[in-house]
């Protein structure tokens, strides 16, 4: 699956980087409880779904090539290059939820669940669950279009979408 997502700034993720979900979990799963003062809080119960092991090995092998440099060239060729040089590619755990986040504190709190958490989006957990249920390898690759903060806008949607589609197309071409 391709598209866009939010990156976790505290992990060094930047706009226009590329996120590949090594695993996914639903950050909204757990039990909603009440504090003594009556306020609600979530007792999280994350269920992590990993990327298919064979696919993970192929991704790691592919990332050893100069794929980041090639992707940057493709961005420049299509007049989509962002101000930074070569985008970083993060193959790391992702979090998935049912709402769009524009809150720096919430984004930082995700690191309490997994210190390597790097991406936040809305479809990956369902994709990975379906893949595991059907015994079909699947992969989530998304461009970082925002950092889940109040500066969120649509400015990087096109670049993020292009990068994720370019990566998946070239990865599949490489392994088949």
At which residue positions do the language-model features occur?
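Intrinsic-disorder/coil detector with helix-boundary
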Residues: 1-176
